[in-house]
Amino acid sequence: SGSIRLKHIPRPSMKVCVFGDQHHLDEAAAGNIPAMSADDLKKLNKQKKLIKKLAKSYDAFIASESLIKQIPRILGPGLNKAGKFPSVVTHGESLQSKSDEIRATVKFQMKK
């Protein structure tokens, strides 16, 4: 299995959600990108049904580097099982370019 980044965006309607600190939440609000803070994630309280619902409602996730280590602790293995563990975004990168990069990346799996 692997992933390839394409020049064009094959899935422009792909839904991306941001798990961010305050800086990224503000940037997401300005760019009209759905976002959740650490407190919003803690409200899910490791309830498997809610985490599965969250994983199903978005195609991909982006997380602030300050939050990335806490995500397995807060959410448990739910996102990993769905194959949607978040990509890291730093304060230097713009959320819009990162979400476009994710939209342009195609995952594939080889069969024997």
Swiss-Prot record:
* Superkingdom of source: Eukaryota
Is the keyword Transmembrane helix in the record?
no
Q: Which GO terms describe its molecular function?
A: RNA binding
Q: Which Pfam families match?
A: Ribosomal_L1
Keywords attached to this entry:
Ribonucleoprotein, Ribosomal protein
Q: Which GO terms describe its cellular component?
A: ribonucleoprotein complex; ribosome
What is stated as this protein's family in its record?
Answer: Belongs to the universal ribosomal protein uL1 family.
What name goes with this protein? Answer: Large ribosomal subunit protein uL1
Q: Which organism is it from?
A: Caenorhabditis remanei (Caenorhabditis vulgaris)
> What are the top taxonomic ranks of the organism?
Eukaryota, Metazoa, Ecdysozoa, Nematoda, Chromadorea
